[in-house]
Regions:
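Short helix-boundary/capping micro-motifs
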Residues: 12-27
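Alpha-helical residues within the helix-turn-helix
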Residues: 24, 42, 63, 116
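Residues within the DNA-recognition helix of helix-turn-helix
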Residues: 29-32, 36-39, 110
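A short LG(V/I)-centered, amphipathic sequence patch enriched
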Residues: 41-60, 250
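Short helix-loop hinge/linker segments at domain boundaries
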Residues: 53-56, 63, 74-97
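Central regulatory/effector-binding core of bacterial HTH transcription factors
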Residues: 91-154
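C-terminal regulatory
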Residues: 133-138, 148-264, 291-296
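A bilobed periplasmic-binding-protein/Venus flytrap-type ligand-binding module shared by bacterial periplasmic
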Residues: 264-274
Length: 296
């Protein structure tokens, strides 16, 4: 068995979630792809892939082996370039994910500058307000807000954001400024369903308040627009309200009761052995995000 080719086939199957798609992309027959993966599993002595009704997923052992294969194949590619007298330059397609609003406001400008710096590169952005599986969905770099589970991935903290409650000055002038979380029950509350997991808002020192939202919006942008219109109070992340706060269109209340900030991390699977395209983007993202006063 050609071990390196078997690794390439396995990686492609894991990334595409399909034996048939792998066969087409690698100009092989589907039975050949199946035989190669089966032979690799026999050689290793562990099941790497499991078929579901719609796709192919990696097992726990397969996920770990996938990371190792990517690192090893990346090392081989860079060694071949070095032996040929070439420097490893970013190449191929980079896939980046982030929360929707954060992606549009702060990641997309990074991607555009990255593509300008490396004209041969292509990029795909995946900005969604749901958990994204980095391995299953073929993500190269993820920008994550919040505390991370132990995934074995490399994570570089680049800043933090606050959970803030804010309203338009006109609303606060009309209805008053709440002095404690308990006073929220006397106010009109607007929430975003994308961030709405519980009617319970938590505050520092374990304080909790049940809120009854008068309006639930399907996007953070809509919730912020409603608050800007002077209609009610909303709770969002500080970067989401940043432009409105800077303009004076919104004002933060109850900041003395805020929970600790949420960390922002740049996350990627391969660590120090990441391919050049990933390292170049990570270096750019870390420098720019750490230099942004909104996150520090």
């Amino acid at each position: 068995m050609d071990r390196w080719q078997a690794m390439r086939v396995f990686v492609k199957v894991a990334e595409t979630g399909s034996f048939a798609s792998t066969a087409r992309q690698m100009h092989m027959s589907a039975p050949a792809v199946t035989r190669i993966v089966a032979g690799l599993e026999d050689l290793i002595g562990a099941r790497l892939l499991v078929r579901t009704t719609r796709s192919v997923k990696t097992t726990d052992a397969g996920s770990r082996y996938l990371q190792d294969c990517r690192r090893i194949l990346g090392d081989i590619a860079e060694a071949e370039l070095a032996a040929a007298g070439h420097y490893a330059e970013p190449s191929g397609t980079l896939t980046i994910t982030a929360a929707s609003m954060f992606g549009h406001l702060h990641v997309l400008p990074l991607v555009l500058d990255y593509l300008d710096a490396y004209p041969g590169m292509h990029a795909r952005t995946f900005f969604v307000d749901r958990p994204v599986n980095i391995v299953d969905e073929g993500i190269d770099v993820a920008i994550r807000i919040g505390h991370l589970a132990d995934s074995g991935f490399t994570a570089i903290q680049v800043g933090a954001v606050r959970r803030v409650i804010c309203a338009a000055p006109s609303y606060l002038e009309k209805y008053g400024v709440p002095a404690t979380p308990a006073e929220l029950k006397h106010h009109r509350i607007v929430v975003s369903q994308s961030a709405w997991a519980s009617p319970e808002w938590r505050f520092a020192e374990g304080q909790r308040v049940l809120v009854d939202p008068v309006l639930q919006s399907n996007t953070n942008e809509s919730a912020i627009a409603t608050a800007r219109a002077g209609w009610g109070l909303t709770r969002v992340l500080s970067y989401q309200a940043g432009p409105s706060l800077q303009e004076g269109a919104l004002q933060i209340v109850l900041d003395a009761f805020e929970e600790p900030p949420l960390p922002i991390h740049v996350v990627y699977p391969e660590g120090r052995q990441a391919p050049a395209k990933v390292r170049a983007f990570v270096d750019l993202a870390v420098a720019r995000l750490r230099g942004n006063p909104l996150f520090n």
